Swiss-Prot record:
It comes from Pseudomonas savastanoi. This is Adenylate dimethylallyltransferase. The lineage of its organism: Bacteria, Pseudomonadati, Pseudomonadota, Gammaproteobacteria, Pseudomonadales. Pfam families: IPT. The gene is ptz. Transfers dimethylallyl groups to AMP as part of the biosynthesis of cytokinin phytohormones. It is an enzyme of class 2 (transferase). One of its GO terms (biological process) is cytokinin biosynthetic process. InterPro entries: P-loop_NTPase, Tzs. Belongs to the isopentenyl transferase family.
Amino acid sequence: MKIYLIWGATCTGKTEHSIKLSKSTGWPVIVLDRVQCCFDIATGSGRPHPEELQSTRRIYLDNRRISEGVISAEEANDRLKLEVNKHIDSGGVILEGGSISLLKLISKDPYWCDRFIWSQHRMRLQDTDVFMDKAKARVRRMLVGSTETTGLLDELVAAQSDLNAKLAIQDIDGYRYIMNYAQARRLSITQLLNVMTGDMKEELINGIALEYYEHAKWQERDFPAEWLAERSTR
């Protein structure tokens, strides 16, 4: 069975690449992102809108609420094995994502070493200006949402009514920045929404984009890059 791995830091175009490959091969995309398993923070976690998928199949390793916490890397790895085995008759699957904890666990698990035919494509982190332009455009779309999608701010407001959700969401990029921004101004999230000015919105967009950039640099440092690069020779 063939596995095509698309990996790289946040905001580098992994989803777009996986959709194109899925359209050309007919293979499903299995997402190696633990946070995207939480359906009630779909926007803030970066899940693509169904229309963006262009009729390709995208599989998450779980379907839970953020109040249940983010799935562990160990459980995600176990579920990944099950999902891959479900699609043996497809001839191949596409793995897409940037969860360092999950990729590190996969790299240490003998299960993944010799039983599959691997190919891989790394989405490289671009220079600061290019990254920030893309990240700010992405955050601008995500922040408020539209008539068809829930915005990141709406997801954050909904989480405030559940202590477990609130505790879990404060560890996630974007949400964490907004919570700290509101706290520094002694505002609740709802109050922040009510007094939001255009300048404040721009401050949030820039701040969240910078938080994404710091996360992306951390990912670049911590990926099991040598093991991942070797997958193209197996």
